[in-house]
Amino acid sequence: KMEKPNKFRDSVAEVILTFGGTDQHDLSRIVYERIKEICKKYQVFVRIVTGPGYRGFTHLEKMVSETSGVSLTHATGVISSIMESADIAITSNGRTVYELAHMNIPGIVIPQHEREETHSFAREQNGFIKMEPYVEGMSLEKVPILLENLIINNQFRYTLFSRLEKFCFLGNKQRLLDKIFEKCIDRK
C-alpha cells in the first residue's frame, strides 16, 4: 500500500520523533523530555519511532509507559504508514527527511554528526527547520521553542507544508532501474 501525502490540518494533533536506526545520542529520549510539556499544553500526541539499533529503548519504554499522550514503536521497517497521522516531525538529517518530504510533514531537523551536516536537503526552502549538529551535552532548549511556534503559528507551518507539496519520490526506484537498464542496452 502506497501512503498518500498528508493534507494540511489547521490544528496540530500529532508530532513524530524519529532519529534513525541507532540514535547514538539518545535524542529520542532527550528531545521527548524537552517537548513533553509543550505537547501536553497543546494536547499534541507524541509518537516516538526508534530503530533496531537503539540502545535506550528499555529506559524510554519505561518513561513512556508512565505517561499518556505518547506512544513508542520500535524497529518498524517502513515508517511512512506511521507518518500518515503526523503534523510535525522532529528527526535527524538522514533518509527519513525524504520520507517526511514525500508525506508533506514539516519538521525540525537535528543532524547527529558531521556527515549529516553535509546533507543539504533539509532547509526552510524545502519545509524543514535545520538546527546545528548535535554534540554531547547540547541543551536543545531551542527545540520546544521551535515546536511551540510550529504548533501555534499556522501560517508559518503552512508555508513549510506548502514547500513540501512539490516533492514526490514514488517513482524514484523505477527511474533508477530504467536508467541502469538503458546504460546496459547502450553498451551492447
List each language-model region with its residue ranges:
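Nucleotide-activated sugar donor-binding and catalytic core shared by glycosyltransferases
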Residues: K1-K188
